[in-house]
Amino acid sequence: MRPQPAISNQYRDGARLIVKPMTTARKLFYYNGGFLHQKQLRRIMSLAGYKLTLGLPNPGDLVAVWGQSPNQYRGHWLAKKRQVGLLRVEDAFLRSVQPGRAGDPPLGLILDRSGCHFDASHPCDLENMLRYDPLDDADLLRRAEQAIVRIRHNHISKYNAFELTQSPPATRYVLVIDQTFGDAAIRASGVGKAEFQDMLASARREHPGANILIKSHAEIIMGLRRGYFSAADETDTIRLLTTPISPWKLFEGAIAVYTMSSQMGFEAILAGHKPHVFGQPFYAGWGLSKDRRPLTGRTRCLSRAQLFAAAMILYPIWYDPYRDQLCALEDVLDTLEAQSRAWRDDHRGWVACGMRLWKRPHLQSIFGRSKRLIFQNDLAKARRASMRKQRNLMVWASADKDLASPAVRVEDGFLRSRGLGATLIPPLSLVTDRLGIYYDPRKPSQLEQMIANAVTLRPDQITRAERLHQQITTTGLTKYNTGKTAPNITGTRRILVPGQVEDDASILTATGQIKTNLALLTAVRRANPDAILLYKPHPDVEAGLRRGVVSDRQSAVLADRVLTNINPSTLLTQVDEVWTMTSLLGFEALLRNKRVVTYGAPFYAGWGLTHDLGQPPTRRVARPDLLGLLYATLIAYPRYFDPVTRLPCPVEVVIERLQDSEAAGHSPINRVLSKLQGLWASHASLWR
């Protein structure tokens, strides 16, 4: 018999898996303060079809208890007395960046009508699924395999507050996993400190002479709880690891893994280990672990993909905080990748230099969630402050002229806003680069590395890039998303020539002989005497805010049409080619399968996707396809910020926000400042 999950409401909309909220709410009574105070938990429960209620339950109602917490007895007693069912609630196996005790809300819950996944004395919904469900659906197992690879590659775990720069010892070791003292899973297993000491002794006995690394729980490292091991257990060959390190890095260096019942044992299975298990967790007994206390009822042999599919795809309910809806596992991975990256970048704090006053509140929102940014105007002072306060240093890219600078350079991203930066509309996308900056080819950048590495994408990355490509081309999104619809343009061989800001950093660093809009127009006309040339001035230049004007007389001689205040996406659908110095419109044209000719060395040139008349760096020898270029440029490289939830977010959320003028528009203060700057356009140094 196939057990029914707590929620059965997933359906597929093209490539996207959608989870619908329940249409009717069942009363769920609770007697635990956590259900009252945790807003996101209450919201997930509501979307799952439960109405959290105080009082006494009636027949047909349910009582909620939190796992096997010490105060669960109240719920058990009332459920028994009122003869109603129990619903056991627990965090899902991927929870958040930081533990709940540190304040992060959950991204998923487990709702179990039968038992607790960590208590083997009574079967739970997950165990029933692992026992009886065929778990043989090809699409389900494909999703599981892809998610396992993705989780390992991106270092995603239940908690994710660790830096990827931290590495375990270089020498091989036996990994022994500690757990929080008195945890419900430990109590359910009927074990204590003596059993943890026995586990450590077994690891020493079975691996004589080997180094042993004891991994502390995240809450132990943060000082929120204590564990079963301490510094007293350290010897010449035993080390207590109290530094937050990715579990996936730890598994790479481990010759064996020992655990009582930690979720890290499950992750060890996903990493290819067969862990020694001394407790009776949900992942024991299926032929994937070496069980010291075998469970007689678990006789089935499962694959890693089957175990993962049940535990991570079918069993939990997942929540999307951006769209405020239930979602699939893949959406939670999008969320955790974005939020974990932000924490890993920002948790040490930043000293920020070269940031204009109007940008600072928005930069504070994006980069200052862990520690507020310290702003400095002088680069030398910023460097000293960075060293003194042990913070990282970020510099607006155009303000850092030193190519050898160790600072992280910051610049607007490629899906920026609905409106221009020069009109003080804050960006929803920013890039940070520790090597260089994407527009300057004189030095390698992180984007350049990512494009080179995108020659080979995983299947899940290809699927995501394809979906994003379709979203961008269907919605017509570009960097700024402004302007009117282009007029109908007829004729053969229509060439778009995008104007640029002539003192823009990409012009100053990535062009050769042709570095003005007039020189560009002249060169394109000389090379294409019979083509229809469409000149589109840069919107900042049109507004009188930046340099780069081509006179009406000059443009009338060289171009067939001059198109002002036009949304470029409506123009790209009507042209055959784009000829440019370094404009981002060249990249946007590639996304729409147009021929692109470059006179400079923009980030997208030199990879075999453009016809290059300039001199891209010879080091660009990789040959990614268009999806590889898109994945590196729009998914892997930038950071995105959701103006609605004020959270780091995946690119797909920004795509949706950019279609909503209210979500992605001006703040009232910046709207006033923008109008004032228009009056002071000739004094741009005051506001740029």
How should each PLM-predicted stretch be described?
Residues 2-688:
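Catalytic-core helical/loop segments in enzymes performing group transfer/polymerization on anionic/lipid-linked
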